[in-house]
Amino acid sequence: MSFYVTNGGFSPIFVTAAVSALTLLAVVSWQVSTAVRERGAANSYVAPASGSDALVSDTAVNAALASDAQTEIGTAVIDGIVAKYLSLQEQGLYTPEVAAKTAEKMAETLKVPVPFRTYTAADIAVDADTSYARMLTYRRDLQVSLAPLLRNTQPEYEIFAYYVSTKDKKNLGKLQRAAQNYREAASSTARVTVPKDALAHHLGILNSMEEFAATLDALVANADDPFASAVLLRTYNQGEADVLTSFAVLAKYYREKKS
């Protein structure tokens, strides 16, 4: 997400961002189903048609899906897939095609919460003055405190897409720096004294920036795990939406303040 400065403050630039992010999510979800096929899921844990070996253990199933790049989040995703696959087997519905489609469908709906620092009213200095003049001072203060966001000139989903296609580690470095810029902006903004009637909006932008920074870090940490990446991209979409919403609400506060 990139930002530019206007007289009203910071405005998000996100033309085509939603479509592009969803396209990237589809690509990574496709990687999930491909990974299932490549790891021989059908041969590894399809129950025999007859005999005493009714079903192999969950451990064997996980081993069949595991890879060197597997992460904790990816393992959790696999656990869910395993449970679904075993259910398909028990119902006699399992085929390699159904299995791959199931993995893809699950990747489209699963989400994972990402822990992040949460600011509360107790963390913020509040001014009882809610005048128009005070709002103007507050807006100028925010333009200074949010300046680190101006370093984020390339959409984060685009950077991650380049990594997915090229595996160039420089792109992961860019994502890490973008996350740091969000945290730096949040830290500086937390030290701004806020008009009492803007406190809720202020907390909104602080927490959304921390959430988005944590999501970017999680994407970097799980970049080579297609299972985790597919889930985290949905978390990314939500985090980005939260940032955009928080700034839109703040802009509305500016507009509605009367002199």
Q: What are the roles of these predicted feature ranges?
A:
Residues 95-168, 198-259:
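C-terminal amphipathic alpha-helix
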Residues 2-32:
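Membrane interfacial helix-start segments of signal peptides and signal-anchor transmembrane helices
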Residues 169-176:
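A loop-to-helix transmembrane entry motif
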Residues 185-203:
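Short, solvent-exposed, charged loop/turn and helix-capping segments
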Residues 32-108:
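Juxtamembrane proline-rich low-complexity "stalk" or linker regions positioned immediately after a signal peptide
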Residues 26-36, 216, 223:
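Structural signature of transmembrane alpha-helix termini at the membrane-water interface
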Residues 179-189, 216, 220:
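Extended amphipathic alpha-helical scaffold segments
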